[in-house]
Amino acid sequence: GSRAQVDKNDFSFMDHGQKIIPDFAYITIHGTPGENGILQGYFELLGIPYSTCDVLVSALTFSKFTLNQYLKGFGVRVAESMLVNKRHGISDEDVIAKIGLPCFIKPNASGSSFGVTKVKTKEQIQPALEAAFKESDDVMIEAFMDGIELANGCYKTKKNEVVFPITEVVSQNEFFDYNAKYKGEVTEITPARLSPELTSRVQQLTSAIYDILGCKGIVRVDYIITEGEKINMLEINTTPGMTATSFIPQQVRAAGLDIKDVMTDIIEDHFN
């Protein structure tokens, strides 16, 4: 293949002297600008349909704290958390009093687990905040929950609803961090080792969250199952990884489907 310069005024490119404007954009870019609404807004202005959630939903789900507070209003269980701005900071004592240890300190708006630290001691709090503030001006401090980590993908079209088999995540690290995600330091079991009843409950919640938010295209909801089979939502990925070893392709295969057919279904849904 060959490379072509893209004209950002209309997202066109030249191919053998012919100007090509795409009929549809399939977005797979993580973080900014593909996951936070920026690219979606660009395509909205150009009138080019795209594969992901719209501007508002993309921006909402990219802000971890805002998403948690929003879904809490619909009865979705999430970890106790607080938001800290870079200008104000927070003392070690306040973190311990309000959230406790261990806890997670993470950028409020960032992808791929960059800048996330599991904090176990008072001495780790400020260095963890500094690392998170390098990625985002707002940082979420979140209570630690011990349990089984899960990931569950879903997509819906006008004619179809597909909730994929669930993946169980067993990280070799303290949590499912960047190295676990991209360097193979994790064991992923699809379908997850759950009872049929718990499997159904997780999948029903994934479908409900999809509808509550008004999602579009494939999304992945991450959970942790704590004592008493309590389902806690961790975060939502509106442009989940699509490499051969990523969760969604694994779940597609486990469902007996082909990723090409799934993507075609999403694209054709717009034109139908």
Region spans (language model):
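A glycine- and small-aliphatic-rich helix-loop capping segment at beta-alpha/alpha-beta transitions
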Residues: 41-50, 121-126, 254-255
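Active-site nucleotide/adenylate-binding loops and adjacent lid/helix of ATP-dependent enzymes
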Residues: 15-19, 58-148
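Hydrophobic beta-strand scaffold residues
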Residues: 49-50, 78, 103, 259
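Phosphate-binding site of ATP-dependent enzymes
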Residues: 120-204, 225, 230-232
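ATP-dependent carboxylate activation and anion-phosphoryl transfer catalytic cores
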Residues: 75, 196-272
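Short small-residue beta-strand/loop micro-motif enriched in glycine and branched aliphatics
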Residues: 51-52, 112-113, 187-190, 244-248
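ATP-binding N-terminal substructure of ATP-dependent carboxylate-amine bond-forming enzymes
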Residues: 1-56, 60-62, 66, 85-93
